[in-house]
Amino acid sequence: MLPQRVYAKIDLDAICRNIKNAMDKVGKETKVMAIIKTDAYGHGAVPVAKALSEIGCYAFGVATAKEAVVLRKSGIKNPILILGYVFPQDYDDLINYEIMHAVFEYHTAKALSDEAVKLGKTAKIHIKLDTGMGRIGMQPTDESIEEIKKIYSLPNIEINGIFTH
């Protein structure tokens, strides 16, 4: 007898129930961001985002600009944060689609600021910290605080949060 092919059954009700349980535990005053990068880990980012949006999930995290734009073009209105690197040629999409970008150095924020000024819009960002995993991010140092202050003073930049990943 030949073994059966592997398949995955995506149960959106179960996904929603699990996220709702987490949201109930942290309380209504806490905003929850569901990480749905890489097509929601193969579960389908668009249907997962739509279902989670309906139950009150505040925001979504993705890996790339392309993933974020797909969500926007599919009608997702929730805030979207790109957790990884974004190529400069994609900055206009981030700004036009109001997608947040993870920033971990001044020169990236400056380039986003320049593009936002050119477009007459605001670029939304989160500051990414490296809290010990050795991944990309600003170190928790006095120098980083000064760099964040410089980023804060840039025109057409809106810092929406700080996170680690």
Each PLM stretch: what is its role?
Residues 2, 6-9, 30-165:
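Active-site-proximal beta-alpha core segment in soluble small-molecule metabolic enzymes
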Residues 3-25:
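Positively charged, low-complexity intrinsically disordered leader regions
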